[in-house]
Amino acid sequence: MAAPIAIPYQSFYSAAKAAINSLTLALRNEVRPFGIQVCAVQPGDIRTGFTAARKKSHAGSDIYKSLDHAVAVMERDEQNGMAPEAVAKIILKAANAKKCRALYTVGAQYKLFTLINKLLPATTVNWLVGRIYR
């Protein structure tokens, strides 16, 4: 979900995900005349070994307090994320669709986040996200 909603302390990751969505939308138009479909899947947090493999290395000073909290929120979300099999089902469905959607958001909570992101002003969404990760 880092593409539509930029996550604090993951600025490069969020930017890369947003770029993938832009690439998907542009490429989709470019290859449409050839009967080729392109889509991107936005799965949100998935339970994998990613959290356990995360390396943390910084001094324990107050300057890192908000970073520590943000990482704790990310780790909790990752550990409680959806099973990889659930995401695989959506990817398989998209791959087998006669006409796929441009963007697939996986999971009810992430669909809700995407809707909120579309309905509220960007400043409000950014403020809310900042409150979650602060």
Where are these regions (language model features)?
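Conserved cofactor-binding/catalytic machinery of classical short-chain dehydrogenase/reductase
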Residues: S11, A19-S22
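Active-site-adjacent segment of SDR/Rossmann-fold oxidoreductases
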Residues: I5, A26-Q37
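Active-site helix of classical SDR
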Residues: A16
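Active-site segment of SDR-like NAD(P)-dependent oxidoreductases
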Residues: M1-I5, D45
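C-terminal tail/cap regions
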Residues: H58-R134
